């Protein structure tokens, strides 16, 4: 039954910085093209936004508040028919420290 299905690697990338994320996506797609794997993506997923509300004053003034937000940008890349060379190339990629990578087979 597994022979009827195509082998697929799904790479999910997360980052606070969208430019780092785009550069990482380009590196992964170039590595896949060099090893003759079919790359689909990057597919942008909705950006998650967390907002934190903090009182400005340490004492009174409940009306004076400050809002901070963290945006998490996400992308998905699917690789179809990867070879062992593709997997070796992907493991040797040097991605920036601000990018979280999750790989599913």
UniProtKB/Swiss-Prot annotation:
The keyword Plastid applies. Its main location: plastid. One of its GO terms (biological process) is translation. InterPro entries: Ribosomal_uS10, Ribosomal_uS10_CS, Ribosomal_uS10_dom, Ribosomal_uS10_dom_sf. SUPFAM superfamilies: Ribosomal protein S10. Keywords: Cyanelle, Plastid, Ribonucleoprotein, Ribosomal protein. HAMAP family: Ribosomal_uS10. Part of the 30S ribosomal subunit. Involved in the binding of tRNA to the ribosomes. This is Small ribosomal subunit protein uS10c.
């Amino acid at each position: 039954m597994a022979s009827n299905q195509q082998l697929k690697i799904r790479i999910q990338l997360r980052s606070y910085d969208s430019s780092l994320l785009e550069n990482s996506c380009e590196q992964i797609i170039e590595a896949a093209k060099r090893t003759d794997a079919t790359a689909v993506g990057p597919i942008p997923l909705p950006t998650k936004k967390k907002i934190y509300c903090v009182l400005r004053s340490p004492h009174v003034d409940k009306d004076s508040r400050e809002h901070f937000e963290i945006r998490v940008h996400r992308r998905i890349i699917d690789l179809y028919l990867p070879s062992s060379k593709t997997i070796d190339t992907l493991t040797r990629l040097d991605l920036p420290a601000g990018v979280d990578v999750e790989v599913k087979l």
